[in-house]
Amino acid sequence: MSRTTVNQGTASLRQRQKARTRQELLEAALDTFSRVGFGLATVEAIAGRAGASKGTVYAHFPDGRDGLFRELYEDLSNRTVERAQQLHQEADGLLSQIRALAQALLEVSSEPKVGLFFSIQGPALSQALEPVTGRASGAFAAMLRQDLESAAEQGALSTAADPEIVSVMLVGAMRAAGIVVAEQPDRIGELTDAIEDLARGLIKA
């Protein structure tokens, strides 16, 4: 085995270890947040939960606690959007497309610990989490706007309201449903159906 191959293998191992440690810190941050809230989720508490030192936290997240929670929120946003895009592509028709986006958001909101952070307390921490908040909502609104514009061109809508405004209102309803589901995960089906019923009023009979 050449020295180059050994060096590459060592570098790859270090990268995997670094990624694993980073993920463990993110999981510890979420766990600490769910137990004590943002105010008491200090770097010391997060490091202790992960079995790491404060230095390790700062080595991976130079901004400390805020950097940790920004990345955590961004990861959840990206996962939500990816799931939404998957379900949206499989949907057939406006009603199914709207339901698909609601389902994606409520699935994430229903997860233990995750829903508390992402759907309830996370958005309220705008100062600490900027500029990563609102990305999932923005992506949802963009997809909905295109769907509504397409339906309007086909004469399928029962409203003449601006699709951009309607899309923002629908996302707001989904976010509100996400708060409920984060606290009561067993209501995910009920809330998804409610969003669909709300959307049905937009479509001509």
Annotate each language-model stretch with its function:
Residues 24, 28, 32-67, 71:
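Helix-turn-helix
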